[in-house]
């Protein structure tokens, strides 16, 4: 299954959850899209698990195949499976680029990475799913700092996560792995674990 490229606003309304983390999608119409969008359906346990999985998958913008692979990799790590899964997703290069404020959305961050604008520890990395380790630096190539999407993002009001840092020269650092209470508070990862373990 390929990565979704349609309207994320429709997805957010269908899931009743802001996948962009801004909340803009639900301000005007806080109900599902389409003719029957305003009808409230009672979901089964499976439906709730699937919905939670889709919320997280669309938030990070990854394909089902990548999502499942990351979930399986998390099972090999020490710690609570669901939490380790979220930490692995947060450690993706495109997500850290977004958390640093180099891009306004994860989709923009993914594009910056895929097009070779990002340096990790001074070396070009063009794989958006590259997994960062604490202490690694993330910067933009010198000529990439003047890109419109970068300038707009850097100059916008942005609340940076505590587990990343950015200096005046736009040198970012993945300081440490995030604590569970520092990101995506509305996601119940246990439902996703139950979905894949059913």
From Swiss-Prot:
GO biological process: ribosomal small subunit biogenesis; translation
Keyword set, alphabetical order: Ribonucleoprotein, Ribosomal protein, RNA-binding, rRNA-binding
MF annotations from Gene Ontology: rRNA binding; structural constituent of ribosome
SUPFAM superfamilies in the record: Alpha-L RNA-binding motif (SSF55174)
Entry keyword RNA-binding: yes
Gene3D superfamilies tied to this protein: Ribosomal Protein S4 Delta 41, Chain A, domain 1 (1.10.1050.10), RNA-binding S4 domain (3.10.290.10)
GO terms for cellular component: small ribosomal subunit
SMART domains: Ribosomal_S4, S4
CDD domains in UniProt: S4 (cd00165)
Occurrences of domain S4 RNA-binding (ranges): 91-154
Similarity comment: family membership: Belongs to the universal ribosomal protein uS4 family.
NCBIfam families registered for this protein in UniProt: PRK05327.1, rpsD_bact
PANTHER family membership: 30S 40S RIBOSOMAL PROTEIN, SMALL RIBOSOMAL SUBUNIT PROTEIN US4M
The protein's role, per its UniProt record: One of the primary rRNA binding proteins, it binds directly to 16S rRNA where it nucleates assembly of the body of the 30S subunit. With S5 and S12 plays an important role in translational accuracy.
Oligomeric form and interacting partners: Part of the 30S ribosomal subunit. Contacts protein S5. The interaction surface between S4 and S5 is involved in control of translational fidelity.
Protein name in the entry: Small ribosomal subunit protein uS4
Gene that encodes it: rpsD
């Amino acid at each position: 299954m390929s990565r979704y490229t349609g309207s994320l606003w429709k997805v957010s309304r269908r899931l009743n959850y802001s996948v962009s983390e801004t909340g803009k999608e639900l301000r005007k119409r806080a109900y599902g899209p389409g003719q029957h969008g305003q009808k409230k359906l009672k979901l089964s346990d499976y439906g709730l698990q699937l919905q939670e999985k889709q919320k997280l998958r669309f938030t990070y913008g990854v394909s089902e195949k990548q999502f499942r692979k990351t979930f399986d990799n998390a099972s090999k790590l020490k710690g609570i499976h669901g939490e380790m899964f979220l930490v692995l997703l947060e450690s993706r290069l495109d997500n850290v680029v977004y958390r640093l404020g180099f891009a306004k959305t994860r989709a923009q961050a993914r594009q910056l990475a895929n097009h070779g604008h990002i340096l990790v520890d001074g070396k070009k990395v063009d794989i958006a799913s590259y997994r960062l380790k604490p202490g690694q630096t993330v910067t933009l190539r010198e000529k990439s700092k003047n890109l419109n999407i970068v300038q707009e993002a850097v100059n916008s009001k942005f609340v940076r996560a505590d587990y990343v840092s950015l200096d005046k020269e736009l040198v970012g650092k993945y300081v440490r792995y995030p604590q569970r209470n520092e990101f995506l508070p509305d996601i119940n990862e246990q439902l996703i674990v139950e979905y894949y373990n059913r």
